[in-house]
Amino acid sequence: MDRTVHSFVERLGIPREDLLLPCTFCSRFLTQEELTAFDFSAFNLVWRGRCAHGICTACARVCASLDLFLHHQNSRPLADVLRDENLTLHGLKARCRVCMKILSVTEKLECAERGESFAKVRGQWRARCRICKPV
């Protein structure tokens, strides 16, 4: 079973524009921009029977918000996270707390520079990406 939109359309031998991928939560078909964002965010396709499903941008944001609200464990500055978890900046896996995109090393540093704490949610670290950062 394919895990990415890219590998799925390659296996099917169809152009990305022809793919109709429903959202797991709202059943709306993802737009071309959302298909790109899906792979960019490193999400995995969900398979129900022989049908693949993704997640639209709106539902990803709602899921991120609910996850943070319902499953927040603690929040700490980046330096504390790296020290306590015995990780390097490259070894720290973190997603955006708003859109769920995987944070780059630069984005992790930008969070620390802004003084933003990293939130532990269901055992995973979250902070804001450069697109979702507070203005």
Curated annotation (Swiss-Prot):
A zinc finger (unnamed) spans 23-59, 96-132. Keywords: Activator, DNA-binding, Early protein, Host cytoplasm, Host nucleus, Host-virus interaction, Inhibition of host innate immune response by virus, Metal-binding, Modulation of host cell apoptosis by virus, Transcription, Transcription regulation, Viral immunoevasion, Zinc, Zinc-finger. It holds the Pfam family E6. InterPro entries: E6 (IPR001334), E6_sf (IPR038575). One of its GO terms (molecular function) is zinc ion binding. Belongs to the papillomaviridae E6 protein family. This is Protein E6. It comes from Mastomys natalensis papillomavirus (isolate African multimammate rat) (MnPV).
